[in-house]
Amino acid sequence: MEHYISLLVKSIFIENMALSFFLGMCTFLAVSKKVKTSFGLGIAVIVVLTISVPVNNLVYNLVLKPDALVEGVDLSFLNFITFIGVIAALVQILEMILDRFFPPLYNALGIFLPLITVNCAIFGGVSFMVQRDYSFAESVVYGFGSGVGWMLAIVALAGIREKMKYSDVPPGLRGLGITFITAGLMALGFMSFSGVQL
């Protein structure tokens, strides 16, 4: 149990997808204007990561891993296309659920919801799972923790950006300029966790 708690904390803070690996920056910067929208996208990312990492773990271990289906057959060259297909299917299902049951959130997320399919944070989580050879249980914890870490980062950035509307930002830095600086300072703050050994 202690191993899973340390993996969860590690994936949220120490190996944060957005602020340590800089994955998923396109939606991270574009959707972080309002806390409410950022929170909704963060929840969607948590759901997709929590489901796609373990599902892709099963697909990899049962089908794609060398000698998984038949001894001597290595289908690992199909990793990328298979993982993207699984992620796309899960995002499509999530999109239909949000459209049916949460129309305001679906409309607020707009084009960014289908973009979760190609969000490199999602694909990064799946790739790290394969690279680190996580078990099924570890992949569930890692997927959930990575999603929570990404949501924590985007909601924090959105909160800061909402407060910056009332600040005296120099004209040359307004918009994405000050957002990049803020994200960089947040990443420096999260770097302080890198010395923690779990």
From Swiss-Prot:
Major site of localization recorded for this protein: membrane
GO-annotated biological processes: respiratory electron transport chain; sodium ion transport
Reactions the enzyme catalyzes: a ubiquinone + n Na(+)(in) + NADH + H(+) = a ubiquinol + n Na(+)(out) + NAD(+)
Pfam families, alphabetized: Rnf-Nqr (PF02508)
E.C. code: 7.2.1.1
Transmembrane segments: 11-31, 39-59, 77-97, 110-130, 140-160, 176-196
Name of the molecule in the record: Na(+)-translocating NADH-quinone reductase subunit E
Protein's organism: Vibrio cholerae serotype O1 (strain ATCC 39541 / Classical Ogawa 395 / O395)
